[in-house]
Design a protein with these regions (language model features):
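Condensing-enzyme catalytic core mediating Claisen C-C bond formation in acyl metabolism
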Residues: 1-5, 14, 115, 139, ...
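Metallocofactor- and cofactor-centric catalytic cores in central/energy metabolism, strongly enriched
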Residues: 2-9, 25, 30, 36-37, ...
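Short, well-ordered amphipathic alpha-helical segments that serve as non-catalytic structural scaffolds
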Residues: 5-20, 45, 49, 73, ...
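Phosphate/pyrophosphate-binding loops at sites that engage ATP/ADP/AMP, CoA/4′-phosphopantetheine
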Residues: 13-27, 136-141
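Buried hydrophobic positions in well-ordered alpha/beta secondary-structure cores of metabolic enzymes
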Residues: 15, 26-29, 70, 77, ...
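Beta-strand segments within the central parallel beta-sheet cores of soluble alpha/beta enzyme folds
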Residues: 23-33, 59-65, 89-94, 145-152
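Conserved catalytic cysteine-centered active-site region
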Residues: 36-88, 92, 96-128, 166-192
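N-terminal leader/propeptide and maturation segments of large enzyme subunits in energy/redox metabolism
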Residues: 122-171
Length: 199
C-alpha cells in the first residue's frame, strides 16, 4: 500500500527529473493536500515530503483549500519565485483516499462545508452539486445531454494522461445509465474517490 508520502515523493521526484535541475537548487516546497489528516492520520506533509526528497533545510509548507489545494500550492511556488525568495520552488498536490470506506471519505470531504450552515442540514457535496444543477437547469434549460457532453469532454482530456485512474472512454449511455448518486447526478458526473499526486 502506497502512502500519501510515497505518492508525493514519486510525483515530485519525476517532476525534478523532468525539469532537469539539481534538486539542491530547490529553495521552497509547497504541498497541497486536503484530507491526509482524517484519512491517513498524517499532517505536516511539507517537512516530511521535503525530508523524503532529501531537499535539506528549506521552507516547506502544506496548504489546504479543499479541491483547490494543489492549485494553491502551485500559486505559492510561483509567488516565491516571482518575489525573488528562491530561483526554484516545487509544488506538489497529493491525496490518498481509496484505503478508507466511502462513508469515511465523504465525512472527511464534508469538512469543507460550512458546519454552521450546510453541515447542519446534512448536505454532502454531491447533494449540493445536484441542487446547483437543478437550479442551473431551471434558469438556463441545462439538459442531461449537455451535462453528459461535458463529462465526455473531460474524460477525453483525462485519457491523454497514461496514469489516469479510469483508462477508458465513456459513452453517453454509460454516463446516463450509471447509478444515481444524488439526483440528477449520476456516478460518472461525480469525481471518483482516488489516490494520486502531481508536481
Amino acid at each position: 500500500a502506497t502512502s500519501v508520502i510515497e505518492l508525493a515523493k514519486k510525483a515530485a521526484s519525476e517532476a525534478i527529473l523532468d525539469a532537469g535541475i539539481d534538486k539542491t537548487r530547490i529553495g521552497a516546497l509547497y504541498v497541497g493536500n486536503f484530507v491526509s489528516g482524517p484519512l491517513s492520520g498524517q499532517e505536516v506533509l511539507g517537512g516530511i515530503i521535503t525530508h523524503a526528497l532529501g531537499l535539506g533545510a528549506i521552507p516547506a509548507t502544506k496548504v489546504e483549500g479543499a479541491c483547490a489545494s494543489g492549485g494553491i500550492a502551485f500559486r505559492h511556488a510561483c509567488l516565491s519565485v516571482a518575489a525573488g525568495l528562491t530561483d526554484y520552488a516545487i509544488a506538489v498536490g497529493v491525496e490518498k483516499m481509496t484505503h478508507q470506506s466511502t462513508n469515511v471519505v465523504t465525512e472527511a470531504l464534508n469538512s469543507a462545508l460550512d458546519r454552521e450552515t450546510d453541515g447542519e442540514v446534512g448536505h454532502t457535496f454531491p447533494g449540493l452539486y445536484g441542487l446547483a444543477w437543478r437550479l442551473h437547469a431551471k434558469h438556463y434549460g441545462t439538459s442531461r445531454a449537455q451535462v453528459s457532453a461535458v463529462v465526455k469532454k473531460n474524460k477525453r482530456a483525462g485519457l491523454k494522461n497514461p496514469l489516469a485512474q479510469m483508462g477508458k472512454m465513456l459513452s453517453e449511455d454509460d454516463i446516463i445509465n450509471s447509478r444515481v448518486i444524488s439526483d440528477p447526478l449520476r456516478l460518472y458526473d461525480c469525481c471518483p474517490v482516488t489516490d494520486g499526486a502531481s508536481a
